[in-house]
Amino acid sequence: MESCFPAMKLNQCTFGLNNEIVSERVSAFWGTQVVKPNHLRTTKLRSAPQKKIQTNLIRSVLTPFVDQESHEPLLRTQNADPKNVASIILGGGAGTRLFPLTSKRAKPAVPIGGCYRLIDIPMSNCINSGIRKIFILTQFNSFSLNRHLSRTYNFGNGVNFGDGFVEVLAATQTSGDAGKKWFQGTADAVRQFIWVFEDAKTKNVEHVLILSGDHLYRMDYMNFVQKHIESNADITVSCLPMDESRASDFGLLKIDQSGKIIQFSEKPKGDDLKAMQVDTSILGLPPKEAAESPYIASMGVYVFRKEVLLKLLRSSYPTSNDFGSEIIPLAVGEHNVQAFLFNDYWEDIGTIGSFFDANLALTEQPPKFQFYDQKTPFFTSPRFLPPTKVDKCRILDSIVSHGCFLRECSVQHSIVGIRSRLESGVELQDTMMMGADFYQTEAEIASLLAEGKVPVGVGQNTKIKNCIIDKNAKIGKNVVIANADGVEEGDRPEEGFHIRSGITVVLKNATIRDGLHI
């Protein structure tokens, strides 16, 4: 089904999928997982060689008078069961850092990778992890997000969840003083819907995942939950090494030798930032990488024991509104809060710059992240579009999505979204084009051109570089978008664009007149 197929990736002289490069790293801190029967699973830290001991011999020595066949092994670890896990995906705030892409949509609804939306990342990770009890909390500009979720993840014509469910919980006002306010933060959003865990559908839930709707990564959440169970944690925070240039944008933490978090600071600055430096070689990083990434950053992905989450939100910290800046730092001193090292690609799509870079990085060889994985596909709305039609084009290191028309144009290091139309002479370089929500017929296009109007797509002989083109944009003939003056920040909404971090952003449904130079 098209809903789980990625867009077509085109490289110079290469038309097809690339072999995925898989690597593993053994951590001196976290150890390597020993494969044993499920009832006898443990973790072995890297240390001096140890002699193997028969576990049944240990039992015969320690319990010589016990009937072995009538008792469970002493070394028993509970296995994580996805049926006992529920996930809550946060729809995000107003998304001011991603403006203007969030002017008419929620952050998780922002298109990415040619044919996906950001919400598809945590949703697909949940599905691939076997988690079928999913709540999505929405508030700001949630129309397109709700529409995408209803079209994609439902029982009728989307992904089949069996006995699971996907519930979209939109912010609403209820009786009482607290119910008269909108969400005040991530924790407050969950608090206002905490009653869902009293519902019959969640009676067997033991652990609750808190996920963000604006991150790009692939993760098996059940490995995360298993670590949470094995460490007997009340809360587990997924984390990764971070360099100094971006450390102040994240929650930072310090851990002890057992992986327990002993200090947590949300987005520290100045001296507070320096105080959070640690020797990340404890995570198994080589000395050079440890020196380059002297911080441990929270991914904003948490798992709570359900009863602990309810207690924290209801009674322990009833006025705390945010997980990262309030709940987690307060809980560190009173609860067993553990760290889980995620040693793979992860990107916070929080700014125009990071969004732009993460998209274009998908075209690189080899990419740090890719949607091409048969075992863990990413799902999206089934649009049933035809293949892309390419006529005498030059395409290098790019991704071209479904249902596009490309005529005698050049596309280099760019992403071309669904239903895009590029006319002859167009040059697209270092550009993320989101595509369109609809087609215009040849007759409609001819009529618009005859009237001096601009159809959806990119007109003849237009040159575009270092740009994000939002959906349904109409860009005329002989236009040049290159930010030749090197403007870092600029606002020209009356002409259909803004500039953020030196990147030109053409607005959704905007019209760029013929011959305009930006």
From Swiss-Prot:
Instruction: Provide the coiled-coil residue spans.
Output: none
Q: Which residues cross the membrane?
A: none
Q: How is its activity regulated?
A: Activated by 3'phosphoglycerate, inhibited by orthophosphate. Allosteric regulation.
Q: What GO biological process terms are annotated to this protein in UniProt? A: glycogen biosynthetic process; starch biosynthetic process
**Which PANTHER family does the record match to this protein?**
GLUCOSE-1-PHOSPHATE ADENYLYLTRANSFERASE LARGE SUBUNIT 1, CHLOROPLASTIC-RELATED (PTHR43523:SF12), GLUCOSE-1-PHOSPHATE ADENYLYLTRANSFERASE-RELATED (PTHR43523)
Q: What does this protein do?
A: This protein plays a role in synthesis of starch. It catalyzes the synthesis of the activated glycosyl donor, ADP-glucose from Glc-1-P and ATP.
What is the protein name given in its UniProt record? Glucose-1-phosphate adenylyltransferase large subunit 2, chloroplastic
Which species? Arabidopsis thaliana
Task: Quote the gene name from the UniProt entry.
Answer: APL2
